[in-house]
Amino acid sequence: MEKDEKHIAEWYNTLSGSYDELYGEEQSHKYEMVLEFLREKHFKVLVDIGCGTGTFLEKAHEICDHSIGIDLSTRMLKIAKDRRTPNADYILASSSSLPLKDDSSDCAVSISTAKAELNLPRFLADLDRVLREDSFVAFTLFQQPGAPNSVSLSKAARSTKISDRETLYSLRPA
């Protein structure tokens, strides 16, 4: 784990007990947008990168056979595990070094994890590695307010600004 990631993990470990109370409503809106994008689909393996307290996987468990939540924070993962979401596993790991086999997932979601100026290239490269062809992807990306959109994604990507600093990108199979 890199130095910045250790600081992030420590911050979320400290925040974990009150995270849902503080950010639950804001995050719930994002989860609903992603679930709308994924509606009427069913996946073999759905991966939630930066799963936090596991709320998204709890809401999405009916659209997949198996789900995997990945997060840097041990305490956030404990809360996620305590939800007892059916057919869900949780892994302590970084979003830029996913401990998953190549071509192992057909859907990946990452909400409020990636930052355009920091880890985006590694994040996208690792996503590409673990996703099967014809996979669905939905992720939000933090960018500095007023900064130009420097993200270059395939033509299949749709973007929706969800706040002054965060954009939702959704990609369907070509």
Where on the chain are the PLM-derived regions?
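Conserved class I S-adenosyl-L-methionine
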Residues: 1-40, 145-147
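Class I SAM-dependent methyltransferase SAM/SAH-binding core
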Residues: 47, 53-97
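A short acidic, Gly/Pro-enriched loop at the edge of an enzyme's catalytic core
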Residues: 96-108
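A short SAM/SAH-binding and catalytic strip from SAM-dependent methyltransferases
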Residues: 107-119
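A short glycine-rich, Lys/Arg-flanked "PGG" loop and its adjoining helix->strand segment in the class I
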Residues: 121-133
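Conserved beta-strand signature within the Rossmann-like core of class I S-adenosyl-L-methionine
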Residues: 134-142
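Short alpha-helix
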Residues: 145-156, 167-168
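Core SAM-dependent methyltransferase catalytic element
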Residues: 159-174
